[in-house]
Amino acid sequence: MGCSHNCDSCSSHCGGEKSLKVAANPAASVKKVIGVVSGKGGVGKSLLTSMMAVGMTRKGYSCGVLDADITGPSIPKTFGVHGQLEGCEEGILPARSEGGVQMISINLVLPHEDDPVIYRGPIIAETVKQFWSDVVWDDVDFLFVDMPPGTGDVPLTVFQSLPVDGIIVVTSPQDLVSMIVGKAVKMAKMMNIPVLGIVENYSYLACPDCGKHISVFGESHIDEVAAHYELPVLAKLPIDPKLAAAVDAGRIEDAKLPDELSGALKTVEGLL
């Protein structure tokens, strides 16, 4: 029998590595999958993920968030979503925020929101896969995947198992930025995942009296780092106490998003 040139459906295993992609739920519809990653924690990755979903929703797109940070989930609280997930014959139904953002998170499965998730790596990886394969995502234009920091099990699982169309690397203005960005970018390139660009969070604080930009965490090095890796800087986002308060209250959909986010939103919009 001749070769069909479709290695995924072939049982001969003669064409190199077999795809590790996990099939989506047959009843689900997702057009684009965007990963949000960081080389370290504390850079506002989940905040950016939430802002991207809100920003694209305000542009008229249907958005979802897959909270892949299994041991440190924060997406439901940011959107003020509580309670347990529900299911149907086709699979798990994602929760929805007041603004219509669909989401799946381990915190929507736990009996209590403050219960710890004490899973080993393989169980965490399988949970992330199920968030893709078992969930009935309803006509989602952009699915943002909020990943834990680093280059461990979850980013590897997402890159191998989900049809990721690109990632956004989140960092902060510190001297460690080059190494941190480098790890995330190199991992993505090793996995053949497109890097859409870099977002610098907590870039500055605008003085409420005079508007002067105060570099709370030191001078930014993001332009040099981005040039080194030949990547665009999608945004330099300020520290915004009002936005932080909205997140704490679960009201991010009511918050004013920073104007500086427009570049990142435009880049993602261009994928459709």
Where are the model-predicted features located?
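Phosphate-binding P-loop
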Residues: N25-K31
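Conserved catalytic-core segment of NTP-binding enzymes
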Residues: F142, P148-A245
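Phosphate-binding/switch loop-helix module in NTP-utilizing enzymes
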Residues: L110-V158
